[in-house]
C-alpha cells in the first residue's frame, strides 16, 4: 500500500505535473470528491472549481480547474480539463469581467445558450474565489 498519490493536470495548452501528494479534493457533477492513497480506480466528470491538494509537507495548495474529467488509477490522479491556472496566474480583472458578462447573458435569456453561460459563470467565480484565498 502506498502512502502518496501522484497528480497531473492536462489541458490543451499545457501539462502541469504536481507530483507526489497526500490528497486531492475537487468537485464532480455529484458533489465533492476526496482522493486519498489507495483510492479505488475511477473516472468521473468535473465541474469548474478550485481543486485543492495537500503536498507531502502537509501544505494546502489550490489550483483552478475547469470542466473536464478526473481519472484515478493505481495511485495516480489525472485531471483532463479545458483550462487550469495557479492563483498567481489568474487575471482577476479578466475573471471579474467574464463573471459580469455571464451574469448579463443569464439575465437576458433570449437567444443564448444557457448551459454555456452557466459554465462561463462557474469558471469566473472559481477564478475569483481562488484569488481571494
From Swiss-Prot:
Primary residence: membrane
Task of the protein: Produces ATP from ADP in the presence of a proton gradient across the membrane.
Keywords (A to Z) from UniProt: ATP synthesis, Cell membrane, CF(1), Hydrogen ion transport, Ion transport, Membrane, Transport
UniProt record similarity statement: Belongs to the ATPase epsilon chain family.
Subcellular localization, as worded in the UniProt entry: Cell membrane
Membrane topology, as annotated: Peripheral membrane protein
Protein name: ATP synthase epsilon chain
A single GO molecular function term of this UniProt record: ATP binding
Domain of life: Bacteria
Organism of provenance: Clostridium botulinum (strain Okra / Type B1)
Record's keyword annotation contains Coiled coil: no
InterPro entries found in the cross-reference section: ATP_F1_dsu/esu_C_sf, ATP_synth_F1_dsu/esu, ATP_synth_F1_dsu/esu_N, ATP_synth_F1_esu_C, ATPsynth_dsu/esu_N
Oligomeric and partner information: F-type ATPases have 2 components, CF(1) - the catalytic core - and CF(0) - the membrane proton channel. CF(1) has five subunits: alpha(3), beta(3), gamma(1), delta(1), epsilon(1). CF(0) has three main subunits: a, b and c.
Gene Ontology CC annotations of this record: plasma membrane; proton-transporting ATP synthase complex
Gene3D superfamilies: ATP synthase delta/epsilon subunit, C-terminal domain, F0F1 ATP synthase delta/epsilon subunit, N-terminal
SUPFAM superfamilies named in the record: Epsilon subunit of F1F0-ATP synthase C-terminal domain (SSF46604), Epsilon subunit of F1F0-ATP synthase N-terminal domain (SSF51344)
